[in-house]
């Protein structure tokens, strides 16, 4: 069986027609764009491969890179012990698989073999090395195993390494990492790469012949190399002897060799027109260098690795799991022997783990169904509540919302944390914009934070004092002469900071934050909400009146909040608080591009309070009472507190609601913190003061796990709050409000699936990948990481740019996972015809469901659950 490129390609490409661009574009789908760690946008590694099934991609990765993306046997056994996998679902999955196969073995015999194999025990090494079994395999050499052969296209450097034990692929990676760091560096060095403005390939070509790390012969190969990246790439492929039909597979192999650096290159290529061909330049550099390194070994007789399947483990599996002795093997007809071997080959480790994963997911779905069914109640008897609070769909909001609802007359909603505002934000005194929306979208408006001119000048002056101290310290550290004196000058102060930060982190951290806030004295601010026609920027500043009304209407309708408004409506963005944490952005709001969501919450609340917006909404039937006031707050997930960031003048009833929230908030924080902290491995005893402990975690610069983040996320529930209000969902569910009765066209549901649904899926599969394949898709141990080039982290100083989450984000201990690697279950509360219409109209989503990238279920108006 030939293992081709995972992507369909044109094998009739004429390289003279510059179709190398198309090949690179097709090959690039095997890697995902990697955002800088400062914004750490969640992404799933296989976003470009969703046209294939999850099973196909799993098999391809196993063959091409020896990467296993199914949960390991130890994870599965641990989940079974915890009651997370029901055996009955495993038997159902096995029966479905057997029904789908064509074989000429008695069903009972096949089932017995599969049942034993599903225990996931390794075949004994003594059996695999047994002379008796190996002799039997030799005597059965007449069996045709051609259908079980695999052919894999590898980089020439890897192929030579496997044949001659030469460490060429590591040498090549070392060089590429070095050049990538030089070109992509954002903040690490004072000197930038010469000729960087001309592009990666030109800058590399200018310097490569002076690289002392290359031999004289290697530099000679590259001395008169083409100046154009596309021409250089085509020439390198030609001289390596790569046939046109194999080029795409070959490029895929090189991209997968360093998926982190290649992913960062791909992301950069999507950010500006100037760097749109950066991925071609990267491949031109990499494969040109490969040619220089491997040239002494060329030509090769065979450019593909032929993976011949040994029948020894197949025979051993029937002996061990099927109770067939070697004597019985010898007495079998050749056709029966072949049938057994093919069956054992099909029921390989990937299939066995796939069945276990399906059983795990079905168990989770059934447990969630039972929770929802046991707590459902009528949704039409809504009483007027004192306050309504809209939180981000983030799974960390679920426990906080649950405790808030229990302790007061409050109603909570779930909505994507950017509140439907496609904006780039610019904080007071900043010249930079941040795209405060999901990374799958582009901002349409720029919103600036404003104050009066005198206040702004004073504030900027105070900011410059702080930044000048930091820049002076950095300059002294990087200067040859002043770096000698820096330890003596800064030692006493930094030593004192180290001691106090280590022994009293909560007190010192709080003091530093208060001191910084006092010194800056940020003035009261407003926003540039009104549309500005004459703007030099690419994005217009502010909104037109129609846009203001449109964005407010869309968000309110999306969550079903179009009537029965409470006196106080609070838009709650969320943020995280941690110290000395490169992954701080990973704990922020994913819907706001890896930043805090308070800015968006404040802008939205301000829009809702505008008389012109309310008048327009009133004309459309959305009647917001005069005494209803919109405010904004920020839910700090690390300490489970609500910080008010925008509280306008309140009406009497709104003030009553505000005071009520303030009075119960300490209890809400205590309960939420206690629930969350007891999940951390550090806590095995009763917590006396959960809030104090949470603050210690947030301020301790030695703390490698300030919070679990979105670990254990498993479902995305789209429906009214009453569906889940009394459920303890254990902080595992994204919750988005939705009222199908206000969505006759289905457009609101389609937008939720296309936007927040996609973000939730990306988050889910990033956690999944970082758990099942941490060596390839994770980022290793935080304690041994190096932040490099202002972009991301490496292990040591010459590794791949690590694309995923650290060990501490998904693991309870060295041997036990905390995150359960399950594909996201999307549950929609709506009639079946709504789901059918969604699947018929949204081909991309239907493809995700059919190919196993997400799971889908629905709850109809009568409370009946349906798996799709």
Curated annotation (Swiss-Prot):
Organism: Bacillus cereus (strain B4264)
Annotated keywords: Cell membrane, Membrane, Metal-binding, Transport, Zinc
Protein name (Swiss-Prot/TrEMBL): Probable inorganic carbon transporter subunit DabA
Highest taxon above the source species: Bacteria
Binding residues annotated for Zn(2+), in chain numbering: 392, 394, 574, 589
One GO cellular component, as annotated: plasma membrane
Membrane topology qualifier: Peripheral membrane protein
Function statement: Part of an energy-coupled inorganic carbon pump.
Required cofactor(s): Zn(2+)
InterPro entries registered for this protein in UniProt: DabA
Family statement drawn from the similarity comment of this UniProt entry: Belongs to the inorganic carbon transporter (TC 9.A.2) DabA family.
Pfam families registered for this protein in UniProt: DabA
